[in-house]
């Protein structure tokens, strides 16, 4: 099997993991996977967006995976984008990760410049979940999902490198030639 029946999966969003999520759904539909005891913690969420906003990462996960498998949505965690107190939002999310026993498998995509989650290259390894000001390049890259660049949130909550590296296993997925240099430099 791919993972224990009660595994804690760290999940990512963006275009890179969509193919993997489609494959997981296919295996679920064939009866090869059961998500009923799975817990998930997502890598990040835009600050200021509610989970029902169609640009939120909660919405993305519902649309691309959770709505298609038998996962208990009360055990699917995404940082609270509506929490205005950044310190509280981050502390709460770190506590969730600890309370579920840590992450068994962390799925990551890698950005063209080498970012994982919203952690830019060179981010401190000791950081846990934190609020980041999105870089201009990240805002531009994500603008394709919004009506205009002005609508792209300027901040996000993201797991830190410390959270990610604490996972028992990490699965880094990259697709397309635009990611080749970033992948090469990360190894």
Please give the residue ranges for each predicted region:
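Short, small-residue-biased leader/transition segments that mark boundaries at the very start
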Residues: 1-2
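Glycine-rich N-terminal segment of FAD-binding domains in flavoprotein oxidoreductases
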Residues: 5-29
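A glycine- and small-aliphatic-rich helix-loop capping segment at beta-alpha/alpha-beta transitions
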Residues: 23-34, 57-59, 121-131
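Glycine-rich phosphate-binding loop
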Residues: 101-127
């Amino acid at each position: 099997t791919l993972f224990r029946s009660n595994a804690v999966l760290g999940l990512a969003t963006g275009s890179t993991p969509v193919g993997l999520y489609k494959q997981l759904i296919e295996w679920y539909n064939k009866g090869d996977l059961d998500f009923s005891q799975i817990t998930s913690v997502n890598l990040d969420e835009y600050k200021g967006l509610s989970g029902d906003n169609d640009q939120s990462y909660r919405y993305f996960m519902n649309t691309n995976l959770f709505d298609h498998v038998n996962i208990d949505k009360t055990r699917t965690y995404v940082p609270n984008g509506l929490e205005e107190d950044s310190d509280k939002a981050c502390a709460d999310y770190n506590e969730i990760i600890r309370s579920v026993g840590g992450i068994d498998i962390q799925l990551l995509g890698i950005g063209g410049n080498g970012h994982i989650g919203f952690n830019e290259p060179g981010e401190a390894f000791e950081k846990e979940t934190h609020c980041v000001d999105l870089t201009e390049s990240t805002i531009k890259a994500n603008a394709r999902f919004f009506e205009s660049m002005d609508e792209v949130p300027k901040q996000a909550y993201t797991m830190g490198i410390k959270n990610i590296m604490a996972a028992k296993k990490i699965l880094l997925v990259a697709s397309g030639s635009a990611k080749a240099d970033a992948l090469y430099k990360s190894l």
